[in-house]
Regions:
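An aromatic/glycine/proline-enriched structural segment found at the starts
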Residues: 34-93, 197-207
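Long, His/Glu/Asp-enriched segments that create or flank divalent metal/ion-associated functional microenvironments
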Residues: 114, 118-122
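Active-site and adjacent loop segments of nucleotide-processing enzymes
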Residues: 126
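Short helix/loop capping segments that flank catalytic or ligand/cofactor-binding pockets
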Residues: 23, 45-46, 58, 102-105, ...
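M16 family metallopeptidases and their MPP-like homologs
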Residues: 1-10, 32-38, 88-111, 129-211
């Protein structure tokens, strides 16, 4: 299936300005926006300035409610093939869906523990995939795996491989084979210690930057 990365050319050439204005008024309203300030600043002064600049923005009248994004379940894999003339590399991506942690538990210990476990697993898997990509007979040019929320109610384990032209299936099999190895045999103590060290270092860096 041929797709455009920026949408319909006809729509871009012929849309009416009112379409943009209506979209802005519908979704870019005060109750759906935030102001983020980063830096070494006088917090009280910045808050006062923000209130001065944005405090008088009127609330939207009859605001349109956000409809939840519902991704339907599927018993068999959903497969799509996309091509684009400007894409110079073959890649395969997949996602395994699961329910997201309910909002009321996010920020609690159980959710933080889950995030930490996923972070450790991603780090260890990606280290392996990187090592494989450096071998002379690697099945892919590069590969990675990660966990993340797809929507408010949906979580997913995601993987991706980039391959030489004509080797998409070979690369995909290489990634899935390594994931199956992890499923069956887990990780080594050395892999775990390296992943733990990376995470601790990132926390230390974040702490120092916040000081």
């Amino acid at each position: 299936e041929n797709v455009s990365l920026i949408g319909s050319e006809e729509n871009l050439k012929n849309f009416k300005p009112e379409s943009l204005v209506n979209y802005y008024k519908t979704w870019y309203r005060p109750d759906m926006q935030s102001v983020v300030v980063v830096g070494d600043v006088d917090a009280d002064a910045v808050v006062a300035k923000i209130k001065d600049l944005f405090g008088q923005l009127p609330k939207a009248e009859n605001p349109k409610a956000k409809e939840p994004v519902v991704v339907p379940d599927n018993a068999t894999p959903i497969v799509s093939i996309f091509t684009h003339k400007e894409n110079q590399q073959t890649s395969v991506l997949f996602a395994v869906k699961s329910p997201a942690i309910p909002k009321q538990f996010r920020g609690l210990g159980v959710a933080m523990l889950n995030d930490l476990v996923e972070w450790l697993m991603s780090s260890m898997i990606n280290e392996r995939l990187q090592d494989i990509s450096r071998t002379p007979d690697a099945p892919f040019l590069q590969a990675n795996a990660s966990f993340g929320d797809v929507s408010n109610d949906l979580h997913a384990f995601m993987g991706a491989v980039a391959t030489k032209d004509g080797e998409a299936l070979k690369g995909f099999k290489g990634l899935v084979t390594e994931l199956e190895r992890v499923k069956r045999y887990g990780f080594t103590p050395d892999e775990f210690e390296r992943a733990k060290a990376k995470i601790l270092k990132s926390y230390e860096t974040a702490k120092n930057n916040a000081a």
